[in-house]
């Protein structure tokens, strides 16, 4: 049993290591180089390490090799969920300057317009993008001296804004839930400057950008009783701190709920969390979709005489979204050339028909070529490809019957039997009625004699 226990322990350790996500996130430090140009330098976020000092990175400047301390654990929790076989996330670092919120509705967060001296010093904003999560993390490098030569820089994650739904695909007419969570842990100097225990006031802002236009969707400052702009499109946000621990760290929720999503609500959603003089923002992409319904007429059979063309086939592709990306193919299955081939004939598409819910419909037409006896039993199929459908698409089909080659089917045989049975019963009934009438007339005739 000991070897088995050891094997299970090793397997468990390997599973934990695989699911723990990357220990280092490679980044680019992006700065303004003047003249409308940007300068980029390699950087890295060290999230976990083994015993001892961090592994050396001679390819990085020490101030851009950041050993991150995450008191709230939000950044670490997000990275642990990252699949080991997924491409590495995209990460950028930039300089950040603490400033009061510029929006009028958020001015209650910062009664004093000057930034406290406790926030002086260098700040960095890390933006990490991936299909799994999207986050922004406000980092404060530590100023403690290190032994020469310095190999890395320690930094604390002060404010982390995170979403686990960076790409949301919502069915047309259904509700959308755009995930947003955030965590805050003030640095030592901030905590010393603030005498009030408990989480600070915060502001939540959701904006939508689409086709070059943007507008405020929802704004909230819980507990400040400020005059807020009216929410748009029925949007509701769960804006609150999750706990009220006196000294932090604190986590909060800013998830947005949109009822019965329509196509006009597609676009980029910007979620911003405002703290006094600090901000964090993430972007989410929302797209609306609806798979098409497909019907083919005439169905289920189409008739034609040898040498004649079958009647026109109509494939109705109804109630789908988006309108782009739709393709219709006509196939002939089981024909004389083999089990599968492209159907010959003249084909065309109708114009789009728009519906009140934002979905669209169109019809595809095919006028097949004249058929021969070899086409008997073949099937015409209308195959539709659309971004909302699987790779092979979706199809509907009808069976071709060539006149003069079809024997009676089982249904026809049953129908003929039932017809004959009813006819025989009818004849017997008429004979019984006639016999009854003749019998009733005989006694009357005898009395008359």
Swiss-Prot record:
Cytoplasmic face: residue ranges? 435-449
Give residue numbers for the site May be involved in interaction with TAP: 428
Could you tell me the superkingdom of the organism this chain comes from? Eukaryota
Q: What is the stated purpose of this protein?
A: Involved in the association of MHC class I with transporter associated with antigen processing (TAP) and in the assembly of MHC class I with peptide (peptide loading).
Can you supply a Gene Ontology BP term from the record?
peptide antigen assembly with MHC class I protein complex
According to the entry, every stretch annotated as the Ig-like C1-type domain falls at 292-399
The free-text domain remark for this protein reads: The N-terminus is required for efficient association with MHC class I molecule and for a stable interaction between MHC I and calreticulin. Binding to TAP is mediated by the C-terminal region.
Residues annotated as glycosylated:
253
Q: Name one GO molecular function term.
A: MHC class I protein complex binding
Enumerate the InterPro entries for this protein.
Ig-like_dom, Ig-like_dom_sf, Ig-like_fold, Ig/MHC_CS, Ig_C1-set, Immune_Resp_Modulators, Tapasin
According to the record, the segments passing through the membrane are 414-434
Record the organism.
Answer: Canis lupus familiaris (Dog)
Short name of any one Pfam family annotated for the protein: C1-set
Cellular component, GO, one term? MHC class I peptide loading complex
Instruction: Give the bilayer topology.
Output: Single-pass type I membrane protein
- The reply on keyword Transmembrane helix is yes
Q: Which Gene3D superfamilies match?
A: Immunoglobulins (2.60.40.10)
> What are the disulfide bonds?
27-91, 315-382
User: In its UniProt entry, what is this protein called?
Assistant: Tapasin
Q: Where in the cell is it found?
A: Endoplasmic reticulum membrane
**Keywords associated with the record:** Disulfide bond, Endoplasmic reticulum, Glycoprotein, Immunoglobulin domain, Membrane, Signal, Transmembrane, Transmembrane helix
